[in-house]
């Protein structure tokens, strides 16, 4: 009792009854935190001004300038000043979804213009003269091309990847030379090049890798494609007979699009290699890792339909789970708890059984460097199962003790969860409201990235004199001498490409003035020197994204809080209006955007401080100073705790603002005092409900994963897989994300109803003048009841 009085004196008196109080339904609301809203609007106006300035003065071409195999920026670096386009020796290697991440594994060279004709060495070498062939060659450098004297030299240069084996009429796109196909060309390309199901071996049978097996087909292709290149616009005269009788629909739409789709469906791609490289970090045996990566990607490609169906079923199951919780909240939540406990018991039994089996069954370890051998050794080791059984047993005991100790609080949590399920089911549109937030988030991210890129392109480019690296990673050595205006140029120093190209060269002899251009030393693009005002604009853009993203999240939260509070403070639930979410949306948008802007501004400032600390931490990593590391660690920890606390405070402030319509500071103070006056209830019930929601998500996720695994394991004829665990893992991850969205709405509902419940307990006493708004179940658990005349009673 003394403790309650102390809390009451410290955090204010309990709320008093107000007969005019109607919660979010009150009509005498006024706009809150208007100055902060005006500040936010002005800030957005400044952001828009920066955006238009960046778009008008920025040039994304500076950031999208292609780089050749020698790390020279086409059209910018010395030696390639007049060569602004990038040519790929084998464009087939570049049509891959992961090329932006992994790069294009083919020689690339800067050219003045993209090739305007087709060249196929394997077909043309015996049909044209050396001079004609030499004129069509595209090589790594003009020096390589100048050293070619015969057709044999051409063959050697092509075999050594110094010159392109083949190319097709191309056009520049973002300064990259891409194939220029017209629809007429599609009629003349053999089907073996466009068959959607062709294998990797068939891919290597392109003109650039022609073999004896396809020499005849390559001849036909060259002849037909040479004739077809002129068909930029289909001719009006008689149509020639195509190579294939059936039309190639994908090619008709667009050949490049068809090739990209096909490449995305191939399994032996860079994605497989990337997965294989990731796996290779965990065990020895690179070849096996690459094979495993190929199989994993193959399973992902083949099982995408199963994954989508499983995700849809998870979504439906979550909705059914929500609907059932409205009437069967207690059984379902207890089932979730006991389901996890039973699952842990089964895990203990299986682990102990496996431990006893392998303890009594001596085995010889399989000596191998592949993954299969490693996994087999681990599973046949009795200690593995011993440690696993101990871990699962500890988890079982901890969860069981928590359930026993918190069983009384769990009853109240179940009642609150039931209230939340009623509220969500009553306004089912709240479940899909997060989609609105996602759309706004995506738009904010796209806008911030776009503005950032344009801002980053404003400024003068800086160049440095560098030496190229060999294939083995060693620095090249070259006697590159500069004179005249470039006499002070040094490796690593700044330079100008035009001056470098004119006054820097390799001295062949010390007695004669014979010089050649520097090949292994270049004046290369280093970075763009942004003016100081542009750097501040970039900082403004980063803060703008933080503020806007927190604003979107806060707005969404307040709309949901207003919806659920409106439901709670409606005495007769059948009187809840149909468009509750819509009314809450417009009420928040009209009256409380200033409060949303205020709360999001506070979080944005704290997050910006955290980002600055992370930046300082990265910069100071090279200085091994224990004191600096300790200070930074303490500051990072402090601001992380501060942001976590402010998020908690903001959420409750938004709820109180949605209920009472007060400004941010008043709402934050009221919610904080209300929580502190009921501190034990808040801590216990909040944690219990979070725990129950986590168990429910775990149950749905485990059910989705187990169902997927069981279906695939018992129906092998439906889909052919190497590892059933691959699609199962994807389904588990997707299911957890889906359930997190649904239970995120639930969490908002419970948080809102809980504050309403606490206020209801303080404001009302159950008399006819001051009836409780809580459900009968909650009143029964708390030992309270409404003393109402029969005609004033309501059904719960």
Swiss-Prot record:
For the keyword DNA repair, the answer is: no
- Cite the entry's keywords alphabetically: Glycoprotein, Membrane, Transmembrane, Transmembrane helix
Checking InterPro entries in the record gives: Choline_transptr-like
One Gene Ontology biological process = transmembrane transport
Where in the sequence does glycosylation occur per the annotation? Answer: 20, 209, 284, 488, 520
Protein origin, superkingdom: Eukaryota
Q: Which residues cross the membrane?
A: 35-55, 304-324, 332-352, 386-406, 431-451, 542-562, 585-605, 626-648, 691-711, 724-744
GO molecular function list: transmembrane transporter activity
Task: State its location(s).
Answer: Membrane
Q: Does the keyword Membrane apply?
A: yes
Q: Name one Pfam family in it.
A: Choline_transpo
Its membrane topology, per UniProt? Multi-pass membrane protein
Broad class of where this protein is predominantly found: membrane
Q: Which GO terms describe its cellular component?
A: membrane
Q: Which family does it belong to?
A: Belongs to the CTL (choline transporter-like) family.
Record's protein name: Choline transporter-like 2
Q: Which organism is it from?
A: Drosophila melanogaster (Fruit fly)
């Amino acid at each position: 009792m003394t403790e309650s009085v102390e809390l009451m004196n410290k955090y204010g008196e309990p709320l008093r009854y107000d007969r005019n109080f109607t919660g979010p339904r009150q009509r005498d609301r006024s706009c809150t935190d208007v100055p902060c809203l005006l500040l936010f609007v002005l800030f957005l106006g400044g952001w828009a001004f920066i955006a238009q300035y960046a778009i008008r003065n920025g040039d994304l071409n500076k950031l999208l300038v292609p780089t050749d195999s020698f790390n020279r920026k086409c059209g910018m670096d010395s030696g390639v000043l007049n060569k602004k386009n990038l040519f790929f020796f084998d464009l087939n290697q570049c049509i891959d979804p992961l090329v932006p991440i992994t790069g294009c594994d083919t020689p690339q060279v800067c050219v003045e213009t993209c090739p305007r004709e087709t060249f196929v060495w394997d077909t043309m070498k015996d049909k044209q003269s050396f001079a004609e062939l030499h004129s069509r060659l595209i090589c790594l450098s003009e020096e390589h091309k100048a050293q070619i004297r015969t057709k044999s030299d051409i063959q050697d240069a092509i075999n050594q990847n110094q010159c392109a084996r083949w190319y097709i009429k191309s056009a520049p796109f973002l300064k990259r030379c891409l194939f220029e196909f017209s629809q007429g060309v599609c009629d003349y390309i053999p089907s073996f090049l466009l068959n959607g199901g062709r294998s990797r071996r068939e891919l290597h049978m392109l003109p650039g890798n022609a073999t004896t097996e396809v020499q005849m087909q390559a001849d036909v292709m060259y002849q037909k494609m040479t004739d077809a290149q002129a068909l930029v616009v289909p001719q009006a005269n008689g149509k020639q007979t195509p190579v294939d009788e059936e039309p190639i629909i994908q090619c008709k739409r667009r050949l490049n699009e068809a090739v990209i789709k096909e490449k995305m469906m191939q399994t032996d791609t860079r994605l497989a290699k990337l997965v294989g490289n990731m796996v290779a970090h965990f065990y020895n045996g690179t070849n096996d890792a690459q094979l495993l990566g190929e199989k994993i990607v193959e399973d992902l490609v083949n099982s995408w339909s199963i994954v989508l169906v499983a995700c849809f079923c998870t979504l439906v199951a979550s909705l059914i789970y929500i609907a059932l919780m409205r009437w069967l909240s207690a059984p379902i939540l207890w089932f979730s708890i006991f389901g996890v406990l039973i699952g842990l018991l089964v895990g203990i039994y299986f682990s102990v059984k496996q431990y006893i089996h392998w303890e009594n069954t001596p085995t010889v370890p399989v000596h191998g460097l592949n993954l299969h051998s490693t996994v087999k050794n681990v599973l046949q080791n009795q200690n593995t199962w011993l440690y696993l059984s101990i871990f699962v047993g500890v988890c079982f005991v901890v969860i069981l003790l928590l359930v026993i100790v918190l069983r009384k609080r769990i009853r109240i949590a179940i009642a609150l969860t039931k209230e939340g399920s009623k509220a969500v089911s009553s306004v089912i549109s709240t479940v899909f409201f997060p989609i609105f937030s996602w759309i706004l988030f995506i738009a904010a991210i796209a806008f911030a990235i776009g503005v950032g890129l344009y801002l980053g392109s404003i400024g003068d480019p800086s160049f440095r004199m560098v030496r190229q690296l060999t294939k083995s990673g060693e620095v090249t050595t070259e006697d590159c001498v500069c004179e005249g205006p470039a006499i002070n140029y040094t490796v690593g120093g700044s330079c100008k490409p035009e001056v470098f190209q004119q006054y820097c060269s390799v001295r062949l002899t010390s007695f004669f003035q014979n010089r050649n251009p520097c090949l292994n030393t270049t004046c290369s693009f280093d970075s763009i020197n942004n003016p100081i005002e542009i750097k501040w604009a970039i900082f403004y853009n980063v803060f703008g994204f933080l503020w806007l993203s927190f604003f979107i999240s806060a707005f969404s939260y307040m709309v949901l809080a207003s919806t659920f509070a409106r439901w709670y403070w409606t005495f007769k639930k059948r009187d809840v209006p149909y468009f509750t979410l819509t009314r809450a949306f417009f009420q928040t948008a009209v009256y409380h955007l200033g409060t949303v802007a205020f709360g999001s501004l506070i979080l944005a400032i704290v997050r910006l401080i955290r980002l600055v600390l992370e930046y300082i931490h990265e910069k100071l990593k090279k200085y091994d100073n224990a004191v600096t590391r300790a200070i930074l660690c303490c500051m990072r920890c402090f601001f992380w705790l501060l942001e976590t606390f402010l998020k908690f405070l903001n959420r409750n402030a938004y709820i109180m603002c949605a209920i009472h319509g007060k400004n941010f500071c008043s709402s934050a103070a009221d919610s904080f005092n209300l929580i502190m006056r009921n501190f034990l209830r808040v801590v216990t019930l909040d944690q219990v409900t979070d725990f129950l929601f986590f168990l429910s998500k775990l149950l749905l996720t485990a059910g989705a994963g187990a169902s997927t695994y069981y279906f695939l394991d018992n129906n092998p004829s439906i889909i052919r897989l190497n590892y059933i665990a691959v699609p199962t893992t994807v389904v588990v991850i997707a299911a957890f994300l889906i359930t997190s969205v649904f239970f995120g709405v639930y969490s908002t509902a419970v948080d809102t109803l809980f504050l309403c419940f606490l206020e209801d307990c303080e404001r009302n006493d159950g008399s006819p003048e001051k009836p409780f708004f809580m459900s009968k179940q909650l009143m029964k658990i708390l030992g309270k009841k409404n003393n109402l005349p029969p005609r004033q009673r309501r059904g719960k």
